[in-house]
């Protein structure tokens, strides 16, 4: 249990520190007929095997999806007294179950969540209720802020995670994310102070914060970080929607700083809100590339190769001015080195074109397996899918291979087209093996084909199983 990022029990005593190994990313491949298996896409960068021995003021960077969820789940499992968390969006079942197990063994669990996450539906309400029923103390976001977008977990008041990621399956399997593990007592005291103030609906009253908080000091800290650059700025960002930050990056490029910017495009590109900023930055000399897989949900800066930033703050006016956000600027050598190495790996596979079409050949059988759909983004192909799980909320219907709706290929049908089928599509195709033909698009890092007509789906067999059904929210 203690061979990941987190120190083993007894870590509070300096002479008991020991090395531990980061979990390697494990990729499970479905065995397919050789004629229908395309050449696999290489991973961008392997996870390192070791990190430095921690100290009482320990700081370490972890990278997702390479390092997996054990770094967080093991910390929760090892809690002796308390778990405190703030999270914008929670859908990951392992995280939910770990919190419930901690509460069941007598650990005090307290958490704050966002009531209305953008595009999150009612999932947070369901998770909130489930945790309350398990005995956790829970509160919604303070109404004084726009969104509670912070991503923080604190274990036993002494081991803290500051992250770019929500607790979703996509965060650990499909997204480029980063997190810091921090044991600095002054940093933790500041986080506890803000948590308690938000919990009690009070002003935290931070005059000179050590960390990067929205809406308190995030804008000023990020501008100072950008303006301090002498030679290089490397950033991986999920959005670019703040004119002032954009202008300071442009100014840096114009004064001779090499600025490299990685983000993920949204389809279609003409509807991507970030594309106008990308183009303005490109015209000003910023080097812009797109990383399609993994999906960039990160919020990072690396300046002159010596100062890094990781946090929940998006480059958006709302994030910096109105949300509760948390980030950290750091100069720890090992953490900066890992951030730099991952950026270089991502830059090497990122492209100047937004949606490069893969050159992989569709097998001779004429279709691909659903597990290979991620290798054929933005191509019109035929996908074979055993419909073993279905969902219909009345607002959308999904056909899926299993119950993990966050991290698999799915067929999507909207209610305006339901009447084209003899019965509801989820009922009609449940338990069938289908060939669906269409453009493979990306949604939250995972592939889907949106279907409008029955002619786009061919039933080719039976699964022999009664399909499972996700409950409608």
Provide a role label for each language-model segment.
Residues 25, 29-55, 355-363, 466-473:
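Ser/Thr-rich, Proline-interspersed low-complexity disordered segments
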Residues 51-80, 86-227, 243, 255-307, ...:
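HKD-type phospholipase D/PLD-like phosphodiesterase module
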Residues 194, 199, 353-360:
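Pro/Ala/Gly-rich low-complexity, hydrophilic intrinsically disordered segments
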Residues 334-355:
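Amphipathic alpha-helical interface segments
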Residues 359-473:
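OB-fold single-stranded nucleic acid-binding module
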